[in-house]
């Protein structure tokens, strides 16, 4: 069995914090599946296909990473991908409580699914997709927080 991990998220948009975690996971695991969740209830800026394409662009240099969109329960996606490890990032102590609850629910639904938590590099510890969108909305420079392709995509969305 290969060492396959899923890194799920909405990735609206994918940030440098996400890509840092993906790159680090790619060094630890044989295969990393970036699972881009549909999450229509979150009212994303980018639709699912756009988020998948942006995530593919920023991870194209990582040969053992694939990006797949999904809907429904994460545990069903994990089974479909034949993965039994889930990776999640913890930016702050406040993230831990929520992630701990999710890990326990996922374990209850799929006992063989293990959750592994990674902390971000210090320079990425405060970056979130929500903050990036907020800074962009108010005309701030987001180039230090996202890949140039993502910054361009956000700018294009704003001019529509």
UniProtKB/Swiss-Prot annotation:
PANTHER family: PHOSPHOPANTETHEINE ADENYLYLTRANSFERASE (PTHR21342:SF1). Its main location: cytoplasm. Reversibly transfers an adenylyl group from ATP to 4'-phosphopantetheine, yielding dephospho-CoA (dPCoA) and pyrophosphate. The keyword Nucleotidyltransferase applies. It catalyses: (R)-4'-phosphopantetheine + ATP + H(+) = 3'-dephospho-CoA + diphosphate. The record marks 18 as: Transition state stabilizer. Substrate binds at residues 10, 42, 74, 88. This is Phosphopantetheine adenylyltransferase. GO terms for cellular component: cytoplasm. InterPro entries: Cyt_trans-like (IPR004821), PPAT (IPR001980), Rossmann-like_a/b/a_fold (IPR014729). Homohexamer. Its cofactor is Mg(2+). Pathway: Cofactor biosynthesis; coenzyme A biosynthesis; CoA from (R)-pantothenate: step 4/5.
């Amino acid at each position: 069995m290969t060492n396959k991990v899923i890194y799920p998220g909405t990735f609206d948009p994918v940030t440098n914090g996400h890509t840092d975690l993906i790159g680090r996971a790619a060094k630890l695991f044989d295969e990393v599946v970036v699972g881009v969740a549909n999450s229509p209830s979150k009212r994303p800026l980018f639709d699912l296909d756009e988020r998948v394409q942006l995530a593919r662009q920023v991870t194209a240099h990582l040969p053992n990473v694939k990006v797949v969109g999904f809907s429904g329960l994460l545990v069903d996606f994990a089974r479909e991908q034949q993965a039994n490890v889930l990776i999640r990032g913890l930016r702050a102590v406040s993230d831990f409580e929520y992630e701990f609850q999710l890990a326990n629910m996922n374990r209850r639904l799929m006992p063989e699914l293990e959750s592994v938590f990674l902390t971000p590099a210090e320079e990425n510890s405060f970056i979130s997709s929500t903050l990036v969108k907020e800074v962009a909305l108010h005309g701030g420079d987001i180039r230090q927080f996202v890949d140039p392709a993502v910054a361009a995509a956000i700018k294009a969305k704003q001019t529509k």
